[in-house]
């Protein structure tokens, strides 16, 4: 499916940055309007991240117009905002395939385009990568410019300030564009600031500034006074003190939707020496009224018709696991005011909106700072509170040392509610929850649970809440639950105990998590026994011993990496028990799982009922 590009006459002339740079500057505002219109149509047909890209249209046009990409390096942070970049870098005709199996990657991806200089998906990485590229450019005397684009949300992460502190010390030439789309840093936007930014980045100002440094070099007292005077004058109209203290020259804030102002300011800044910050103010969802009014709700969208100004109504479905968690958290908070909910900027995705509204004093959004979120939970546990850290599997990777050093080592009763465990689908390899069972299983003092349905999830969360001898983790997938009837009464499970769900012969399938229904279907065809193991750690030693002694072979099934996962734990236990037994491990292969619809990926990996049955039959053939 392709669009009639004649609707976008200027965009039709700019399929690559080289073509874009041939256009007269006078047509750039029209190009921005057409690019925004094309983005509306393409995402409406394909689904994807939406509001962020609408807010970076003018910025993207200006960056590729002023900088000689891909020779000059452009590094995007996270990548939600990079759809306009993809459209302008040769992928326009394939944008309708974004996030689909075999289609355009959802984030900037090195393997996909030479314009994607750094593969991204998690926040806070851009400045570190850009700094290294700037150092390399200086070592090679390449004359290459380097730009990092980062949002104000990502600026809350500690890695960002580590990188800026280092960049200020090294003093290599680089530009950091701070895309402020929440007005969380400054509201000083207007003609005065646009003019000031162009003036302060212009040749006259910078020449005077550098010449004064040389003249005052031998007069340190006067030099320090001049520096403080300059910072004071800039500080009266711009909020750049923090960046200046880190060693950056700060310009802005300016209107991020004025493409001419962006072009002129970037032209001035392109040849400035040392690290620079350009602070721009943008509106998430710009140009599409529903997204402007509700940028969070329109952050990522399914397929929709832009002309209706409405997202399609959600189809009736079973509650999601995130909603099951959110309801449980509210239910338990009603009874215990010492329950605290912590999230690293994932309130909506983790199902915590209602909790945050009903229990604001028990709710803590740690921002995009996973390390801090985990240790915050540890500190609360020290003071007798019951912290629940709600976090995506892929983002828990960023707080792993804190889980070990600050939580498990001290046996602190922190409950980790781990969302997006297993295959998440369209967001691809940066977001698949493939490794959590493996990296948690090796941590002493951890109790790890994997529910097979929403009722088990609710009971396991309560089990973790009741457990006081160390940290617990309940790991569940993205999306709708199984339709199991939820039992409102909460009962703590016996730690480390599984259940036989089907009695068969010869083959025993040990299932961990929500692939239980597929395991049961496969077992019907094979007349196999099925155990819902429930606990990844500690394992049910008695149950495993019983199954090993009464069956010819064991099969483990999990939606986690085979290497180091629950199946590996079964093998280790059998060795300890001195019970040699053929074991087939079914799970995720030793590779990064690409993007696509979850059902497609599950089927391709042989994790549906048909695939599980076939893998077992092939193993015993």
Swiss-Prot record:
Domain of life: Bacteria
Pfam families for the chain: DXP_synthase_N (PF13292), Transket_pyr (PF02779), Transketolase_C (PF02780)
Residues at which thiamine diphosphate binds: 80, 121-123, 153-154, 181, 288, 370
Pathway stated in the Swiss-Prot or TrEMBL entry: Metabolic intermediate biosynthesis; 1-deoxy-D-xylulose 5-phosphate biosynthesis; 1-deoxy-D-xylulose 5-phosphate from D-glyceraldehyde 3-phosphate and pyruvate: step 1/1
Gene Ontology terms describing biological process: 1-deoxy-D-xylulose 5-phosphate biosynthetic process; isopentenyl diphosphate biosynthetic process, methylerythritol 4-phosphate pathway; terpenoid biosynthetic process; thiamine biosynthetic process
Reaction it catalyzes: D-glyceraldehyde 3-phosphate + pyruvate + H(+) = 1-deoxy-D-xylulose 5-phosphate + CO2
Enzyme class: transferase
Matches recorded under Gene3D superfamilies: 3.40.50.920, 3.40.50.970
EC number: 2.2.1.7
Residue positions binding Mg(2+): 152, 181
Cofactor: how and how many bound: Binds 1 Mg(2+) ion per subunit. Binds 1 thiamine pyrophosphate per subunit.
TM ranges: none
Reported cofactor(s): Mg(2+); thiamine diphosphate
GO molecular function, one term: magnesium ion binding
Keywords, alphabetical: Isoprene biosynthesis, Magnesium, Metal-binding, Thiamine biosynthesis, Thiamine pyrophosphate, Transferase
A GO cellular-component term linked to this record: cytosol
Family per record: Belongs to the transketolase family. DXPS subfamily.
Subunit: Homodimer.
Biological role stated in the UniProt entry: Catalyzes the acyloin condensation reaction between C atoms 2 and 3 of pyruvate and glyceraldehyde 3-phosphate to yield 1-deoxy-D-xylulose-5-phosphate (DXP).
Protein name stated in the entry: 1-deoxy-D-xylulose-5-phosphate synthase
Taxon lineage: Bacteria, Pseudomonadati, Pseudomonadota, Gammaproteobacteria, Alteromonadales
